[in-house]
C-alpha cells in the first residue's frame, strides 16, 4: 500500500491557515499556494538519489553531491493545479510540465477529460501529479490512470488538502502511488466539498465563481 505523507512543517501549516481563511483575496491566495507548493516540493523530492561529482571551489577541489540524473515531470490537473506549478519550478527548474484537463460533472461528481498535453517521454520521468484538493479522488485517480496508460512508471500525487474519501479512492486504484498532503481534513459534504477545506481552489486562485 502506498504511503500518505502529511507534511506538517510549521511554515507549511502557517501558510495553509492563511490559504483557508475566507478573507484571503485572490492575489494573496495565489502567492500562498505557490509558496506552500515550493515547500512541499522539498519533501516530495527527498528520496531523489545523489551521486558524487567533482567540484572546484575558489580554494580547492572536492567531491560534492548532485542529484543523479532524474528527469522530472510536473502534471497539474487543470485548472487549479496550475497554481502550484511555479512554486515547484522554482526548486526544479528543469522539470517538464504536462497538463491534464479534467472537470467534475456536477451531477455525478465523476471526472470528465477535456484536455491533455504531456512530455513525450513520460515513461522515463518521475511524475508528480499536482492538484490543491483531493476531494472525491476521482480526478486524481483518472489522471494517474491516464498517465499509466501512456507508459508512466513513477508517479507521486501532491495536494494541499485531502479528504479521507479521496485518499481511499486513490489507494483503491493506485496502491503504488505515494500521496503527499499538507493536511487531511474531516470529510466530504453532499456536494463533494472538503470540510472544513478552503472552498473552491480554482475560483479562489483565478477570481471566478
UniProtKB/Swiss-Prot annotation:
Pfam families: UPRTase (PF14681)
Description of how activity is regulated: Allosterically activated by GTP.
Keyword Transcription listed: no
Extent of the signal sequence: none
Documented EC number(s): 2.4.2.9
Cofactor: Mg(2+)
Annotated GO MF terms: GTP binding; magnesium ion binding; uracil phosphoribosyltransferase activity
Gene3D superfamilies: 3.40.50.2020
Cofactor mode of binding and number, as noted: Binds 1 Mg(2+) ion per subunit. The magnesium is bound as Mg-PRPP.
Keyword terms: Allosteric enzyme, Glycosyltransferase, GTP-binding, Magnesium, Nucleotide-binding, Transferase
Domain of life per record: Bacteria
Catalytic activity: UMP + diphosphate = 5-phospho-alpha-D-ribose 1-diphosphate + uracil
Residue sites binding uracil per the record: 194, 199-201
Binding site residues for 5-phospho-alpha-D-ribose 1-diphosphate: 79, 104, 131-139, 200
Pathway membership: Pyrimidine metabolism; UMP biosynthesis via salvage pathway; UMP from uracil: step 1/1
GO terms (BP aspect): UMP salvage; uracil salvage
Family from the record: Belongs to the UPRTase family.
NCBIfam families referenced in this protein's UniProt entry, alphabetically: PRK00129.1, upp
Purpose: Catalyzes the conversion of uracil and 5-phospho-alpha-D-ribose 1-diphosphate (PRPP) to UMP and diphosphate.
Alphabetical list of PANTHER family matching this protein: ADENINE PHOSPHORIBOSYLTRANSFERASE (PTHR32315), URACIL PHOSPHORIBOSYLTRANSFERASE, CHLOROPLASTIC (PTHR32315:SF4)
Name listed for the protein in its UniProt record: Uracil phosphoribosyltransferase
Organism this protein belongs to: Desulfitobacterium hafniense (strain Y51)
Amino acid at each position: 500500500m502506498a504511503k500518505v505523507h502529511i507534511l506538517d512543517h510549521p511554515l507549511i501549516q502557517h501558510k495553509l491557515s492563511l490559504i483557508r481563511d475566507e478573507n484571503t483575496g485572490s492575489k494573496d491566495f495565489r502567492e500562498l499556494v505557490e509558496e506552500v507548493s515550493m515547500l512541499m516540493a522539498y519533501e516530495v523530492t527527498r528520496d531523489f538519489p545523489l551521486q558524487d561529482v567533482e567540484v572546484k571551489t575558489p580554494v580547492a577541489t572536492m567531491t560534492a553531491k548532485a542529484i543523479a540524473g532524474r528527469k522530472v515531470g510536473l502534471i497539474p490537473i487543470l485548472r487549479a493545479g496550475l497554481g502550484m506549478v511555479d512554486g515547484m519550478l522554482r526548486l526544479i527548474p528543469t522539470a517538464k510540465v504536462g497538463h491534464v484537463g479534467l472537470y467534475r460533472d456536477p451531477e455525478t461528481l465523476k471526472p470528465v477529460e477535456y484536455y491533455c498535453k504531456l512530455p513525450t517521454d513520460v515513461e522515463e520521468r518521475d511524475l508528480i501529479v499536482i492538484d490543491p484538493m483531493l476531494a472525491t479522488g476521482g480526478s486524481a485517480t483518472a489522471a494517474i490512470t491516464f498517465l499509466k496508460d501512456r507508459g508512466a512508471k513513477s508517479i507521486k500525487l501532491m495536494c494541499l488538502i485531502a479528504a479521507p474519501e479521496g485518499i481511499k479512492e486513490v489507494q483503491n486504484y493506485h496502491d503504488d502511488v505515494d500521496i503527499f498532503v499538507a493536511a487531511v481534513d474531516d470529510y466530504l459534504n453532499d456536494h463533494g466539498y472538503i470540510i472544513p477545506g478552503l472552498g473552491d481552489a480554482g475560483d479562489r486562485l483565478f477570481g471566478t465563481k
